[in-house]
């Protein structure tokens, strides 16, 4: 019948541990399929997919340039992001949460450049990502004939001289300060400065805003129309509700799951350990030199975290004793 029965091998995820975490979250959610109303289950699934798309993208932006520098994917995943739980654009926590997102936004250019480096080597070598990273670190000849050929092809497709369009004279002027034989560097610079490069940045910003469900009850990012309030990491009430449902599950020795209660601190630590989202950074290595104001911000954030849990019905003050302040499962698997 002329049907192509050959199937290309499905590529493995670039960040394997992050993909495994997404799979585990979906498995945990499926444990509730007979206990949750269908609309609630679908909403949790939607929120989880958005969360993991956003986290995966943020981690690739952070880790890919490091992987190229080291020549391997086998790096420690030390990505983290402060999340502001106060729902107040001018809170004491907001500047620290904004700074983490600003750091990510400032690295977009380096990330986009890294993707072009990967693409150029894979187009040349037709190899997998691990070999590409090794090649970039150990063997890449920046004056290679392949890069010269691609660069010349781009140049030859430009008009010789045009007052309205980017032409060969403009390209020569743009590359005049490069080493004459650095064809790889020149090619990267041309790609970065092209409409393709600027388009990638705009797409990346729009994609993260969408995946993180910015400014919605399910949000991982928030901002306002004012430049005074740029993007910052947050955990919206619906997202927090979804995470709590997953984190009150504990795996038993026989491999099955049961629901359990968690203290406020245990829940905050679980969110940090599992997703890299920092609510209380007082014990974080990143903030070992934190001043009094930053420590006060984290204490304020923990109080806001507690209030948000109270608002969504997972937490009731039963005692002043910290040990008795527990997050109790809304749906029990043992029922």
Predicted regions and their residues:
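Residues within HEAT/ARM-like alpha-solenoid scaffolds
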Residues: 234, 262, 297-300
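Long, low-complexity, charged/polar intrinsically disordered regions in eukaryotic proteins
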Residues: 158-245
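Positively charged, polyanion-binding regions of nucleic-acid-associated proteins
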Residues: 236-264
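C-terminal engagement modules used by replication, chromatin/transcription, nuclear envelope/ESCRT
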Residues: 291-335
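Short acidic, hydrophobic short linear motifs in intrinsically disordered regions
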Residues: 257-274, 278-290
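Long, compositionally biased intrinsically disordered regions
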Residues: 1-190
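Feature representing long, continuous alpha-helical segments
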Residues: 241, 265-269, 273, 303, ...
